[in-house]
Amino acid sequence: MLQQLLNKEKNNITTAQVDFSYLLPEISARIETGAKMILRNQKVDTYSEEYDALSQQYIENNLANFLYSYDEQIYSLYGIFGQQLGKFKYQGGIRIEKSYQIPNLISDTIRIVNDYFNFFPSAHLRYSFSKKSELGLSYSKRITRAGSGELNPFTSYSDPFNLRKGNPYLQPEFINSFDLSYT
């Protein structure tokens, strides 16, 4: 089977970030704060034709044609406080995040909005036994979001032997990471 596939894609990504750090030398501490914004917009227009041996022409394959839009907005604020007390160092922080993922087939009347509000704490502790020996313990919460292709609800026929279809209702993955180290 011969197939022609025309895929037009447009991607826009806008990122803005501001960070502030303030040292408090009188108590051997540091404060950091900041904000970040990420805006993504993607449009995918796919047109497919299959070769018809009888008519010896390419014929439009309506099953494989689609127009897909993906919008993502992530807004976050963070704050961190760290201090050293003799041989002991600690740091604690929090990131607050509001995010939207909007994966939609433009031809579809169903509008899907994945809307999330999350807190991401972190804590790091270190104790120095000597200049060459240190024990550390840390915790952080992270997020992994599905990408636009994983959320695309249209079945891709670009390869007749391997069909792909995303799930627009996929939820993000949250990871609680603990680390114990000795150097």
What are these regions (language model features)?
Residues 1, 44-52, 58, 102-109, ...:
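Outer-membrane beta-barrel translocator domains and adjoining extracellular loop/strand segments
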Residues 3-13, 68, 106-116, 167-171:
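Outer-membrane beta-barrel proteins
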Residues 3-91, 126-130:
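Outer-membrane beta-barrel transmembrane domain signature of Gram-negative proteins
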Residues 11-17, 72-78, 116-122, 165, ...:
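Transmembrane beta-barrel architecture of outer-membrane proteins
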Residues 37-43, 85-87, 96-102, 139-145, ...:
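Transmembrane beta-strands of outer-membrane beta-barrel pores
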Residues 66-70, 143-183:
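Outer-membrane beta-barrel signature, preferentially recognizing the C-terminal barrel domain
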Residues 72-111, 116-122:
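Surface-exposed extracellular loop regions of Gram-negative outer-membrane beta-barrel proteins
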Residues 128, 132-138:
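Acidic/polar loop patches that form or flank catalytic/metal-binding clefts of enzymes
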